[in-house]
Amino acid sequence: NVAKEGCYDFVVVTHQGDSAMTRIKWVSANPLEEPSRDMLKRSAGGLLSKKQAQFDIDALVYTLSEVHPDMFSVCRQSEWFKSVNRVKQQLPDSVTTVELFKYAAPLVTKLGDGHTMLRFPFNDYFTSSTIRLPLFLNVKSDYTLRVRGCIDNLIPQDAEVLSINGKESRELIESMMDYASGERDFFRIERINSDFSALFEMMYAADKYDVVYRMKDSKKKLEVTLHPTTWAELLPRMPKKKEQARVLDYSFKVDEKKKVAVMDFRSFNNPQRTKMFADSMFVTLREKGIKNLIIDLRNNGGGNSMVGDVLFRYISPKPFKQMGKALVRVTPTTIRLTGRTQMVPGWSFYNDESKGNFIPPLTKEEGHYEGSVYLLISHHTFSSAGSFAWAFKEFGMGTVIGEESGGMNVSFGDIIYYKLPVSGLSCTISFKRFWQYGADEKEIHGTLPDYAVPQEGALAKAFQLIKK
């Protein structure tokens, strides 16, 4: 019975009287899953040694290969492992967790899976003493930066930042793409938008920031110098935000003169509540003789896909389904990390397209909507909202207007959480692959609109089409 980390010294004596000193020592059967105490021991200052950083990268590579259903669907295997070796060789003698993230995150990004990523260690970097750029920015899909807020309102909200310390906005954004997982650049820019402050500090922290900007709808360039501050100093000096009314998951308005209703659809939550909402909305449209319905999905990040099925029953001209196929990989590592002991190791492939289990639409008597339907989508239409947009077009439910959706027709998903053993860096890894109904992995893309316009102009385009 050798205890974990145990070490036992004793003398072995043969029946002839010969003896030998013998040591029995506990060694992990798989050190990448169960490292030794010595490997996990950090320095007093919290730094990782080069050996520990290399170990964390090896553990990351091992776990990715044990969990992900198709690591190399985008990146060539040989090129990826060359990158792994290069990063391990480039590591300095010691690193912080943030520095390890800077080295390792691009390796995960290369896999091209928007759900598989290394997460920035915000709590390790941003402390009460951290000084930071006192400027908050929105990153746009056209590679521009718009001001969300600035200390003392030195740069007004919605002004366009052209450069910071001589680095133009496009250059800043492009340099951060290595840290943004995703299948499309616009999807990755959305990731950068969420993490911009952290990535900027990691890559471009300075003693002062010379910012060149211009006001909205102006070509005149203006300049200001900002100095880094702590969060405690920054917060009371930020412009006060206007109180915003809570946005409902779904709501609708009727324009009786134009005979048009607009459904503002923000989130796929609560199928039961959706059913009550849909009943009420379609009764209203029927009573008022509204023959055109615009469903606005431009700022919908997804949720429960059953919500989509509820709405589809009112608008689909024929039986429908959202999901086509799914591939699931389960390994002992998957089971260990999820804690789902009921899982059985192996591969499972589900082909719903070969089955006849389509969902029937409502009959006219049950409340089916007989008018024209227009769907507005954007690069921000993700997850279940992306699936909704795909099925809407695939089953001919109406006209799609806007930008390619952020959610792809073939994608990896259903993530597990994994922490690198020494640094504690957090990672999400997909263990399933999904195909929307009728999708082909040879042509991976989001839902393509029938009328491609910038998302800001999608509603106006819908009204224009209705007027015709």
Language model: regions and residue ranges:
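Flexible, low-complexity junctional segments that flank or bridge functional domains
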Residues: Q16-L293, L297-L327, S372, N409, ...
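Extracellular recognition modules
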Residues: D9-V13
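Hydrophobic beta-strand core residues of beta-sandwich domains
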Residues: V2-A3, I155, V453
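Conserved acidic, small-residue-rich alpha-beta core segments centered on
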Residues: D18-S19, S305-L459
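Surface-exposed, short loops/turns at beta-strand junctions within beta-sandwich domains
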Residues: V2-G6, M202-A205
